[in-house]
């Protein structure tokens, strides 16, 4: 089980709020669809410029990029404790799809790192693992 999230519902609530906020800010700048297959706790998130869908809401939506990772790995990424290149090299994050598209998205996410810390405070989550 996750060090950060003690249950699946809290992890889903946190990431849905965080990504909704990001999508509202970035809007059409997000010209890619993402599918996150999250482990420990297990759930899926589909994200595009229209919003976020979780688990059964995803239906048959197809993503440009698919990520498989643990929720703790995602947490470490957003806290800037783990870079995406290192996570990929060590197989902490596995991807399917166009990696160059992902790398183009990273600069857009720069302001999100500070916001993630704000969400950690709001949800009383650790800011270090």
Describe each region flagged by the PLM.
Residues 1-129:
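Feature captures hydrophobic
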